Amino acid sequence: MNLLPNIESPVTRQEKMATVWDEAEQDGIGEEVLKMSTEEIIQRTRLLDSEIKIMKSEVLRVTHELQAMKDKIKENSEKIKVNKTLPYLVSNVIELLDVDPNDQEEDGANIDLDSQRKGKCAVIKTSTRQTYFLPVIGLVDAEKLKPGDLVGVNKDSYLILETLPTEYDSRVKAMEVDERPTEQYSDIGGLDKQIQELVEAIVLPMNHKEKFENLGIQPPKGVLMYGPPGTGKTLLARACAAQTKATFLKLAGPQLVQMFIGDGAKLVRDAFALAKEKAPSIIFIDELDAIGTKRFDSEKAGDREVQRTMLELLNQLDGFQPNTQVKVIAATNRVDILDPALLRSGRLDRKIEFPMPNEEARARIMQIHSRKMNVSPDVNYEELARCTDDFNGAQCKAVCVEAGMIALRRGATELTHEDYMEGILEVQAKKKANLQYYA
């Protein structure tokens, strides 16, 4: 039993030695190292120890440098944070330049580091009306900047710290309709054809664009609604704004007539720029005849300014860069005095006429405005419609209001047919009376 370990131990020792030799060969230890004397191996070991110490000191130095760089980065980040919290100086980007310096400096010549930078540089104009060249743009990526952008810069170094949102005139921002109107197409009587034409030209291209793409047709850019006063042009525009999810901007023609030269044209530009930013959007211009009259020779500066405002409107309607996501709805009572350039195809493509309501339409209008009232069952709307000849939609609504006031005056709980007849007489008296006042 005791002989087995003595027999196996030499074999095991040889295997271990073979393993050591294999590892030595794998580790790249040459035969010359194995043939070295003890003193040489001790000397080699001391050399390796010294190299290890040198490498450790190098690692320690690199670690210190890394920590110093981290501290510097932290300090710079805090400086940037402090600078960014300061009030910005508002500026506009005038131009972006590509800088590629030529290496033609003589040996020993002084070299300006700013002049040797490569990449993008910027020219800005501050709100203090000063222009600066920035060899280093700042914290904003140069690829995200374009001429005309509004930026915030440091008031001392003028480095660009942040891009600011586009500035629009406060009057243009007030034109945006925040609260949706409550009118619906069912609240409009006698204008079924006009509603269909408006939906086809404005609503369908926004909600179902693929239908036009499948047919290969281009939808109309704008709609002109014209007709006598009180026929429902503005009411239909409010219903269109309520039924679409697009941004709705309401302009009035007299708003665009300003005292200072170029102010009206700037309002038009800002309105269309805001509409493009918030596309899809609808611009409704009421009383277009205030600025869209035919051009004529005039020596008055006011007339020329109105014509310049109309020219800017023409350019925005059919400019060099058309936008299919912005639709224009214009309304006017005097289509006969509009400039032919506004009426041509390509600007206000579809013209929708709003005629005076016929007998059936007048009956429908009075039914719509009376549906929330306590009306007696004996009210005959067809007879009322026959009695309201030459009434427009607004006057038919006024008849319902007057009938309600008459019923309220006599303390009734419901409106009768006679109340409506008296209301018709009241509206006719207001319509036909010719009052003259004497001092």
UniProtKB/Swiss-Prot annotation:
Name of this chain's protein: 26S proteasome regulatory subunit 6A
Localization, UniProt:
Cytoplasm; Nucleus
Keywords attached to this Swiss-Prot or TrEMBL record, sorted alphabetically, are:
Acetylation, ATP-binding, Cataract, Cytoplasm, Deafness, Host-virus interaction, Intellectual disability, Neuropathy, Nucleotide-binding, Nucleus, Phosphoprotein, Proteasome, Ubl conjugation
Q: Does the keyword Secreted belong to this entry?
A: no
Q: What species is given as this protein's source?
A: Homo sapiens
| Keyword Iron applies | no
Q: Which GO molecular function, any one, fits this protein according to its record? A: identical protein binding
Summary of subunit composition and partner proteins: Component of the 19S proteasome regulatory particle complex. The 26S proteasome consists of a 20S core particle (CP) and two 19S regulatory subunits (RP). The regulatory particle is made of a lid composed of 9 subunits, a base containing 6 ATPases including PSMC3 and few additional components. Interacts with PAAF1.
Instruction: Give the gene name.
Output: PSMC3
